[in-house]
């Protein structure tokens, strides 16, 4: 029940272009142990929900951001502080950090994005992709 309540009360963010900065969010969720509250001996499951594609390493050049993602925590007051300082993380960096931190990612995505995230899940060890209904009412079932 607590999980369902937390999902209903989750903060929803957006982006100005079609692809999202979800990789930045994933990286911070994975590496910010204390800020997120990951416990030492818990099973770590990260559900990433979206209806859009993603930005990855190299896309930051379009906005003049060329410093590679360093894969460390940059959160203050629950806000990511380096979105204009460093590029989005690469798929390989996300995979490395997910393996280091023993985190399982479920990409809960809409039908239109499922093929992309299914392919992505093949490159992020232990992750999987599932289809999220258009109104997200099946997220708890995933």
What are these regions (language model features)?
Residues 1-142:
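Divalent cation-coordinating acidic motifs and surrounding scaffolds
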């Amino acid at each position: 029940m607590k999980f369902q309540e937390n999902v209903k009360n989750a903060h929803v963010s957006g982006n100005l272009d079609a692809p999202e900065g979800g990789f930045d969010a994933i990286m911070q969720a994975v590496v910010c142990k204390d800020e997120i509250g990951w416990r030492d001996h818990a099973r770590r499951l990260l559900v990433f929900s979206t209806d859009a594609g993603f930005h990855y390493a190299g896309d930051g050049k379009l906005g003049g951001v060329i410093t590679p993602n360093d894969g460390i925590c940059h959160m203050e007051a629950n806000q990511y502080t380096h979105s204009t300082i460093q590029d989005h993380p690469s798929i390989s960096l996300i995979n490395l950090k997910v393996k280091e931190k023993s985190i399982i990612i479920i990409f809960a995505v809409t039908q239109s994005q499922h093929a992309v995230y299914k392919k992505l899940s093949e490159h992020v060890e232990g992750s999987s992709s599932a289809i999220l209904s258009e109104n997200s009412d099946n997220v708890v079932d995933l």
